[in-house]
Each structure stands twice: as structure tokens, then as C-alpha cells.
Amino acid sequence: MFRVHLMEFCLLFMTGRDLQQISGNDTFKVGYLSSREIKELVPSFELQQKYHDLGVPTIEDILKFISGSVRQVILDVKVGPPLYEKGLAGSVVSSYTKLGCKNCVVWAKSDNIPRDVLRLAPDATVGYIVMMDPSTGTRTQLLRMRGAWVVGVYHPLIDGKLVKVLHARNKKVYAWTVDDEESMKKMLIERADAIITSNPSLLKRVMQDAKTQCLEDGFSLSA
């Protein structure tokens, strides 16, 4: 999954954490700087030692590199300064259409973004986010947005009942962000359709262990 921010002149793949690491300033947010200022940042000595040729890619850079080698690319669109939602959906659609990305999924915490994407590109694959509402402490509405076939659900909220409800509406359940082994196992048991993680090596091992256990117990699994 890649996070997309709209800057003054281009779409960048970057999180606030990325910017803080590169700049060495833990108060920076992506919207505080222009795209030119971000690209001119000099990474810390420690980062330069650990990684070579550091830079901030655009959406076109990433899609050219990754879209042909994975089953699906999730564009997690972040709304923020300086432009907020203005022109954001159009920029995303223009970028992935230009590169012929047929396996892109667009979602955002703001429902306006995927709705605007669908309006501009009716055949696009979009999703919406289900999480805990920080202002009320309750789960955001589960069934909403006509035409969205992917639902990104904050993984502690996922159980068999939630999966059953969404599957009954032909919606896929994508669990985010699952980085510990026990939660990964739970998502497999609950039949989440996809697991978003920052630790793909661990997830691969957990899935292989589950497959091995099923085979030992006499179940046959397709690849």
C-alpha cells in the first residue's frame, strides 16, 4: 500500500514519518513544504549510510516500478495542506490512467475522494475505510458508498460477523495495518480477503505455517 499526497505541482508518495526521518525534524508534516523543498532535502548521515540514492518518488515513479509485478496496488490518498481535496481525485485518476494501471485500488479516510474518483472514472476500483471514530469512540458506518467493492477495516474491528456482512454485499475485506503474528493469524482465521502489513516477511511465514498445518491435518489447499 502506498500513501499519496497532493503537493503544489505533483503527487508524492510520502508519509509524515518519512519526511521527519529524511529531514531530521520530528515536527514536519508533508503539507508544510512544497514539492521542490521536499525534493531538495538532504537526508541525515545515518540514512545515507543505511540507504543509497534516497529520494521522494512521485506516483508515476512508483507505479512504473511496482504495478506490473504485484497483483494489486492500493493508493491510500491522504488529504491535507496545502490543497486538501481540491483536484486530488482528478490528479490520482490522471496519473494511474496515464500509466495504464489496471490493478490500482484507491481509498481514503475521506469518502469524498473515492466518490470523486468513481465520478471521473466509473470503472475504477475504489474502497472506503472503516475504523474507530476518534470523536465518538464508535465504529464508522460499515455499509456505505455504492460502487465501492473494497473495504479497508482497522484490523481489531474484524470478526466473523463483520466479514460475513460485507461478503454478503460482495465487498472485499482488507485488514490494516497488521504487523504482529497473533493478529495475522486471526485475520487468516476470520477470512479477511487481504492483509496490509509493514512486515511482509513475517506475514509470508505465518501464511506458510498455516498452510503446512492444514496439510498436516488432512486439508488440501489450492495455491
Protein language model regions, located:
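Generic recognition of cysteine residues
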Residues: 10, 101-104, 214
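Short acidic catalytic loops
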Residues: 1-7, 74-78, 187, 193-199
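Hydrophobic aliphatic residue packing
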Residues: 2, 13, 56, 62, ...
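Metal-dependent phosphodiesterase/phospholipase catalytic core, i.e.
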Residues: 15-131, 146-149, 153, 169
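GT-A fold catalytic core of metal-dependent nucleotide-sugar glycosyltransferases
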Residues: 1-21
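Hydrophobic pocket-lining residues within nucleotide cofactor-binding pockets
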Residues: 7, 18-19, 30, 43, ...
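C-terminal active-site rim and adjoining tail of enzyme catalytic domains
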Residues: 49, 127-223
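Short glycine-biased active-site loop of nucleotidyltransferases that positions the nucleotide triphosphate
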Residues: 11, 27, 141
